[in-house]
Swiss-Prot record:
Belongs to the IPP transferase family. Its cofactor is Mg(2+). The gene is miaA. HAMAP family: IPP_trans. Transmembrane segments: none annotated. Its EC number is 2.5.1.75. This is tRNA dimethylallyltransferase. ATP binds at G31, P32, T33, A34, T35, G36, K37, S38. PANTHER family: TRNA DIMETHYLALLYLTRANSFERASE.
């Protein structure tokens, strides 16, 4: 038997995890697309023995796999992933539904003395938990939505800018799903969604880690990943989804899927498809960074650092030790420099 390993397989030279003694809290790994969040969260979950919860608004849906960069079946076999791949694509899964499901799972983990890990790039999903936003529990309104869908997308977004400029500033102009949802809330409640989101912060400690890199490097990562996704069969995935659900499915109007749909309809030449997806994904990443930079307490790490897993581990163990000794969190690290 390896003398450096305990009976449960843990490396005895590694500092013991403080998870058994620290006050249970929540570790969040956030950041823009293509920064490797899922990989780092998986490594941390395996090391801590913690539940791993998804906070990506498109990865909750079944069958939307390649284009959402959903963890592969092989990755999910390594460690259980929760709040992922469980919603029918025809159902509009609301932030309120996510918040309720995530809060329930976090509470269950805390009862077991565990500190779960929340990972994703959907800022509103994450902030609904970390800030305890009061998300309007407005069920989908099919008749209202059908009426709103008769408007051209650019008119819907312009109208949202007039009715709720705060919400519009947090939604990409091409994100028709969230634009429709925001308008649905406004017309149902008579109040802007941003006004209704009153915060009730949770009473447990939270460590918020953000992965980033300068935009030129991030664009290279986006371009590389887009090429890999197309090579992995993304176009075939879109063809199958369009055949199964029809081209008007709201999820098929989201980033990447909409561009491939336009290509399949002959509205985008093949040579322009990949550059267009890369460009729009870059724009989306910039909006994500704007959101995350505004989140208080976030600690930034370079997503391309060779020792990134160890950096994350040191931050987490120091934070958990602080909960045990003083009930306070470590000082917040400097924010990343603004991109050119």
């Amino acid at each position: 038997m390896d003398q450096n390993r305990s009976p449960n397989g843990r490396d005895c030279r590694e500092p013991p995890s403080p998870s058994s003694t620290a006050r249970p809290g929540l570790v969040v790994i956030a950041g823009p697309t293509a920064t490797g969040k899922s990989r780092q969260a998986l490594l941390l979950a395996q090391r801590l023995g913690s539940p791993l919860l998804n906070a990506d608004s498109r990865q909750v849906y079944r069958e939307f796999d390649i284009g959402t960069a959903k963890p592969t079946p092989a990755e999910r076999a390594l460690w259980p992933h929760e709040l992922i791949d469980f919603v029918d694509p025809r159902h509009t899964y609301t932030v309120a539904e996510f918040q309720q499901a995530a809060q329930a799972r976090i509470a269950a983990a805390h009862r077991q003395g565990q500190t779960p890990i929340l990972v994703g790039g959907t800022g509103l999903y994450i902030q609904s938990i970390t800030a305890g936003l009061g998300i309007p529990a407005v069920p989908p309104q099919p008749q209202l939505r059908a009426q709103l869908e008769t408007w051209p997308p650019e008119i819907r977004y312009a109208w949202l800018q007039q009715l709720d400029p705060v919400a519009a500033g947090q939604i990409h102009p091409h994100d028709e799903v969230r634009t429709l949802r925001a308008l649905e809330i406004i017309y149902t409640t008579g109040k802007p969604a941003s006004y209704l989101r009153q915060a009730h912060p949770p009473d447990y400690p939270i460590l918020l880690l953000g992965l980033h890199c300068p935009m030129p490097r991030l664009e290279q990562r986006i371009a590389r990943r887009t090429a890999e996704m197309l090579a992995a069969g993304w176009i075939e995935e879109v063809k199958t989804l369009r055949q199964r659900y029809g081209p008007d499915l709201p999820l098929l109007q989201t980033l990447g899927y909409a561009e491939i749909g336009a290509y399949l309809e002959g509205r985008i030449p093949a040579a322009e498809l990949q550059p267009l997806i890369v460009r729009r994904t870059r724009q989306f990443a910039k909006r994500q960074m704007t959101w995350f930079r505004a989140m208080p307490g976030i600690q930034w790490l370079d997503c391309e650092a060779e020792d990134l897993p160890e950096q994350i581990w040191k931050r987490v163990t120091a934070w958990m030790a602080a909960q045990t000794s003083a009930g306070t969190t470590p000082a917040v690290a400097a924010r990343p420099p603004a991109d050119p």
